[in-house]
A protein has these predicted regions:
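Histidine-centered divalent metal-coordination motifs
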Residues: 26, 58-59
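Residues in the helix-turn-helix
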Residues: 55
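Amphipathic alpha-helical dimerization/coiled-coil segments
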Residues: 1-13, 35, 84-109
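N-terminal helix-turn-helix DNA-binding core of bacterial DNA-binding proteins
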Residues: 12-52, 74-86
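A short, conserved structural fragment
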Residues: 64-70
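Short, hydrophobic-biased segments on the C-terminal half of alpha helices
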Residues: 30, 60-61
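Generic alpha-helix initiation/capping and coil-helix boundary signal
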Residues: 7-8, 48, 64
Length: 109
């Protein structure tokens, strides 16, 4: 298998993104934002009912600090969307590998 280029900056970015995405709750948030629509915390809270608004806000803060999501304020509401196009590519690739690819479905236990 080919080795990835040994570029400190790119490895650092990849590590930061994967670390932030590696949490199942944050991964779920990103999947909800992957359609390109902005969503407020309250909208995300309705969709992801297993997280309190406080926990959801903390996870969104972590994603924002990692430059994975961006915010837009409209009056008192803050809307979130995916900032980094690479994150969308990663999400699509994972969907293809683990959901769309019939060969992968056969090999999973």
């Amino acid at each position: 298998m080919a080795r990835l280029p040994d570029l400190d900056t790119e490895q650092s970015k990849a590590t930061m993104i994967l670390r932030a995405m590696g949490n199942s709750k944050r991964f779920r948030i990103l999947n909800e934002l992957a359609d390109g629509q902005e969503r407020s915390v309250s909208e995300l809270e309705e969709i992801i009912s297993t997280l309190s608004q406080s926990a959801l806000s903390q996870h969104l803060g972590r994603l924002r600090r990692a430059n994975i999501v961006r915010t837009r304020r409209a009056s008192q509401t803050i809307y979130y969307s995916i900032e980094d196009a690479d994150v969308l590519r990663i999400l699509r690739l994972l969907t293809h590998i683990y959901i769309d690819d019939p060969a992968m479905k056969k090999t999973r236990h």
